[in-house]
Amino acid sequence: RSSRYALAQDIGRAGSRWPLYRIDSLGRSEALGELSALHGGGFHFAPARPIPAFLHGDFAAGVFPGLPWFLDDQRPQGFLGRTFVRRVATDIGAPEDLTRWQADDVVLALLRYGEDEPGDLVLGEHALQRALQAALSPEALSANQRETRYPALADAALAGEDIGSSAGGEQPKFTALLRSDAGTQAAIVKFSERSGTPAAQRWADLLRCEHIAGQ
C-alpha cells in the first residue's frame, strides 16, 4: 500500500538523475544520494544514508512537489544572483530575467555552474569536479592586486545592471578570494557606482561608515 510510482522526466539534455555531494570544510566530498526529476515538475531524492534533516514530515519518502528545499536555497537571488544569471543564461538556455526562472533552470545552472554556490552542496559530477579543481588552484588576489583588480571586478559585476533598479535596497557587490600570509579568505566586496552623483556619494559614505562600525 505504501508503494508510489512516478515517471522520470529529462531536463534538457542533462538527463533525469544526478548525484548530490557535500563538500566539507577541508574540501573533501561525500556522496549524499541521488536526485531524480519526475514528470509533472516533482523531484525524488534517494539518500545514500539516513539524512533526517533532509527527509522529514511530508517529505520523509523523499518526494518533493518542486525542487527540494535544500537545493532551492541555492536558487540565484539578489544582486549576485542576477550577475550569475547574466553569465550562464545563454549557455543553459534559460531566461535572462531571474524572475522567470523555473526549477529546471535552477537544476541546469547547478549542474553546469554550481561549484561555488551558497552552502556545502554540489549537484552532479561535473560541478563536483569544478569545485575540487577550484579548491586545488584558487584564483586568489594578493593585497597589492586589490587596488587594480577591484575596480575591474566592480565594472564586470555591473555589466548590464541598472544600478538604480536594485530591488529592496540591494547593494552592488562581487565576491573575491583574498590571499595573505595567513592563507586565503573568501570575501564579499560592496561598492558604489563611479558617477559622482549625490546618491553615489551617499552610498560611498554609508559603506565607509559600515566598514568603521564593523571594526
Task: Indicate residue ranges for each PLM-predicted region.
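Phosphate/dinucleotide-binding and metal-coordinating scaffold of catalytic cores
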Residues: 1-215
